[in-house]
Amino acid sequence: MARGPKKHLKRVAAPKHWMLDKLTGVFAPRPSTGPHKLRECLPLIIFLRNRLKYALTGDEVKKICMQRFIKIDGKVRTDITYPAGFMDVISIEKTGEHFRLVYDTKGRFAVHRITAEEAKYKLCKVRKIFVATKGIPHLVTHDARTIRYPDPLIKVNDTVQINLETGKITDFIKFDTGNLCMVTGGANLGRIGVITNREKHPGSFDVVHVKDANGNSFATRLSNIFVIGKGNKPWISLPRGKGIRLTIAEERDKRLAAKQSSG
């Protein structure tokens, strides 16, 4: 009987969106416990080594982190397996680069560069609202932040904009039809569209219908919806493709057109 925490992760069992090949080794970096779930995060080592190619080995990543160059959400992180996740801002002071972790339409974390201005805030989905001791209202976000005394108009499933320096809420977007959202789970992971309607199913999962910029409609669970803008104006810059998933035929046509124009 195994007691205590698991400390290893086999490469074959690692999440597919990390895009690790099966044959390079036996193990994958097991993310530390932190604000994002193991299967929904991207360990810092994979971001620096496999995505940005700033290091060749895990030891090199360790050396970069231990020099305190890497900040996540404005805090220095020296743990190479720190679980960065959706909407986190990764800043590298030395190179003056800032990244926001958002999904591309294939459901992977895109390397999405942002300006220093945009790196000052992040969006968080409200998971839970409760009243604690002495009647103080608390709000819990998707990245495990607990914020006291939130605006009483903020409800569960809304999105709050958080200033990373102070950790305070600066603004919020209601979960409402007509607002722009990104899908953060399920088969439509990474797609962006406008909420058209919400079906309530008491005792089961509420279903939300979304329509993307090309007019394609799809439905997903309420728990997978993350509001990112009022109307159709996003509050963050979007990765390439703007969250519109092409069909296989459309992708092929796009590739051929690009090939002809270059050839």
Swiss-Prot record:
Q: Which HAMAP family match?
A: Ribosomal_eS4 (MF_00485)
Q: Which residues form the S4 RNA-binding domain?
A: 42-104
CDD domains found in the cross-reference section? KOW_RPS4 (cd06087), S4 (cd00165)
- PANTHER family given for it? 30S/40S RIBOSOMAL PROTEIN S4 (PTHR11581), SMALL RIBOSOMAL SUBUNIT PROTEIN ES4 (PTHR11581:SF0)
- Any idea what this protein is called? Small ribosomal subunit protein eS4, Y isoform 1
Lyase recorded as keyword: no
Supply the SMART domains for this chain. Answer: S4
Keywords from the UniProt entry: Ribonucleoprotein, Ribosomal protein, RNA-binding, rRNA-binding
One BP annotation, GO: translation
What cellular-component terms does GO give this entry? Answer: cytosolic small ribosomal subunit
Q: Which residues form the signal peptide?
A: none
Gene encoding this chain? RPS4Y1
Similarity comment:
Belongs to the eukaryotic ribosomal protein eS4 family.
Q: Name one Pfam family in it.
A: KOW
The UniProt entry, under InterPro entries, shows: KOW, Rib_uL2_dom2, Ribosomal_eS4, Ribosomal_eS4_C, Ribosomal_eS4_central_region, Ribosomal_eS4_central_sf, Ribosomal_eS4_KOW, Ribosomal_eS4_N
Specify the species. Answer: Monodelphis domestica
Q: Which GO terms describe its molecular function?
A: RNA binding; rRNA binding; structural constituent of ribosome
